Amino acid sequence: MGNVPAKLDQDASSYTGRSTYTDSSSASGVGAFRGAGGTMDETRARGRRTSSLVGNILNGPTSSRNDPTGEVSKKQLSAAKKRGTKERELLKEENAKKLVIKYNETVDGGYLAPHGCYSLDKMDYDSDIVRKLIIERKLAPFYIPLQDFDDSWTKDEVKKIVDALPLHAPFNEHVEEYEDVPVGDLNEPHFDYLIDKKLSKKEQKKMHALIFKARLYRKRLRWQESENNAYLEEKLQNRDNDIPKNSFLPNDDLKYDLYAQGSECPICFLYLPMPLNYSKCCQQPICSECFVQIKRSEPHFPHDEVDPSQPQKDENEKDPNLLISEPANCPYCATPNFSITYTPPTGRKVGIGGQAPNLYKPLGTAGNAPPTYTVSSDDIRPDWETKLNKERVRLARRSANATAIHVSNRLIGPQRTGSFANEDSPGVAGSTDSRSAGVANSTLEELEKQMIDEAIRLSLQDEKRKAKR
């Protein structure tokens, strides 16, 4: 939008030639139109310039910068959108793969991926960051939970119960949302052939997103089942050995030490090995699977007090820069900027960076105490600010589009009707045009100014965003 003045000059010069042609042609035609011809041509030229601004704002700043003519091939835009969609889908698949529990990725008796107490769509944290924090022992690992624990259980009873635990919680194979949704061959990367081409483009887009979600759910189920089967196979082969041959399987001492001194998470009410994470503000325990659910609010406008005597503003009329995303509050005491602290166990360092789980022996607790680490809910979702800015841009464009469409409708409707009427009735042209020319000029000048102001505002916002980066 920074090139608005140049665009206006260019349009003005090109339309001047058209005005000359109109004057010369009208001279040999209707004499009555001659007096008001210059005024009406100027009005039409201004209308075209304003319509050009409307088009620029509707098309957005990107298209006008990439293509100086303002004309971008529809095929190119469509191809770019498809590439963007495919890249986003590949990223989602990669993230889903990292949410699969693997029995050979273990830290201190827990794992790098969640057990499955919550649905996949809630696991939108940065999995690379969480995995790194667990490996560095700055966040409690994801443990396999027990529904309950009885202090009277013997070591053999605890061993049998732990041996029966599945690596991942059972999946619901019949999700209502995905019923009757075709998924096709999951080994094939493309699935557009499953979409009914008779649907509108909007409906096809919705169907594409739904099929992708259903396919991803099925793929994740398949990936996790494969890991579950491998884990079960290894356990069956080593069930009669006090010390498993597979170095990633825990021995009996580790199984007992993990669960004999556990604790219940007050949010999910599941029993898990210690130590857990603790809220920094009120020192309440919270498991990692519950912690990763807690995040900032979605971008929204501040909740101002509503004055019933004043008309309520539509979202399109509000300043997009007022959008906010409030930090997460503690689920226990509602303190803002929620963070947890974690102190790794002193006598148990197994798996990645420690002893082999099958050779576990309790370590001595003498010596320096391990450091305590702090992790905030923003640390595991560092892209919150990017999402907020994207929503601001989206709302700004939506507001600009609404303004542009409104102005365009005001320009096209009465102006074109009046022009066509004058051309069909040349005898009345002089009187009608002379009366309406002043009003038309005034209205178009006002609309042109409004569109220029809008263009400048969007350009300034764009520059501010660039400066922040």
From Swiss-Prot:
Keywords: Cytoplasm. One of its GO terms (biological process) is cellular response to glucose starvation. One of its GO terms (cellular component) is cytoplasm. Residues 1-86, 301-321, 414-441 are annotated as: Disordered. It is found in: Cytoplasm. The keyword Cytoplasm applies. May negatively regulate the SNF1 kinase. PANTHER family: PROTEIN SIP5. This is Protein SIP5. It comes from Candida glabrata (strain ATCC 2001 / BCRC 20586 / JCM 3761 / NBRC 0622 / NRRL Y-65 / CBS 138).
